[in-house]
Amino acid sequence: MTTVLVAGATGNVGGEVVRALAGAGEVRALSRRGTPVAGAVPLAGDLSDRAAVADAWRGVDAVFLPAGHPDVPGLLADMRTAGVRRVVLLSTGAVVRGDVDNAVTRFNLVSEAAVRDSGIGWTVLRPSGFMSNALQWAPLADVVREPFADVPVAVIDPADIGAVAARALTDPGLEGQSLRLTGPEATLPADRLAVLGEVLGRDLRLEPEPDDEARARLGSAMPAEYVDAFFRFFRGGEYDDSRVTTTVPDLLGRPARTFRQWSEVHAGAF
C-alpha cells in the first residue's frame, strides 16, 4: 500500500490533495499544529524547522511539497535518506521567465532546482492564480476593492490542482514533468465577482483599488520584495497569467472547473 504525505495539508491546495487521494492508500497530513484532516493521519511539524520534521518522512513513499521553505535541499535530502521515492512540488506559473531578480519567481525556482537535483522522482506543478483567492472578499460588504482590476487571469480551482497532484503522487508516468495548470478561461476580477454575486443572490460591485493604496495595504501583510514582485508581474507586464492550457482536462479527462462551480461549492464561506 502506498503512503503519501501531504505537507501544508490544511491549506487551500493541500486540503484538496488530501481529498483527491481518498482511497489511494495511507495519507498523512502534515501541518504546523497537526490539525485533524478527514481521511488522513494528522502530523504536527513546521517545514521551516528541518529537524522537527525529520521523522515525518519515515515510511513515506511520496510527498506533496509546497515551494519556498528555507531549506528545501535539506528537506529533500532527509526524504531521500528516509526512502521517499517521489516528490510533487507546488510551484507557480511565474517561473517560466526565469527571472531571479523577482523574489516570488526566485524562491520557486530555487525549490524547483532542488527537487530536480534531489535524486528523487519528481513532478512540478505550475498553476495560475487560485480561485480561492476570492475568499478574501468574504469579510467585505457588497462593494469589493481589488488591486490589478484590469488584469485578466486564468484562475484555477484548487480542487483541480489537488486532483492533478494526486495523480502525480501515485502515477510514475508523470515523473520528470513540469505541468502548467490553469482554469478554463481568463477572467477579470469584476467578471468573477459578478458570477459570485449571481450564485449568492447579492448585488456585488467591484471598485478598482488605486496602485498606491494597494501597495501600502499589501506591504502591511508581506515583505516589500514580494509586493514589488506582484507589481512587476501585473503592472510591469513580467508575467501573463491569462494564458489557458489544456493540461488539466488532458490529465483528468474532464473540463477544468469553472469559477461558477467553485463559487457554488464555497458559497457558504460568504
Predicted ranges, named:
Residues 52, 130, 257, 261:
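Residue-level recognition of oxygen-bearing side chains
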Residues 62-65, 89:
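Redox-cofactor binding/interface segments in oxidoreductases and associated redox assembly factors
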Residues 212-270:
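A hydrophobic C-terminal alpha-helical subdomain
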Residues 43-46:
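Cofactor-binding loops of NAD(P)H-dependent oxidoreductases
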Residues 2-33, 37-38, 48-51, 58-60, ...:
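Oxidoreductase cofactor-interface core, primarily capturing Rossmann-like NAD(P)-dependent enzymes
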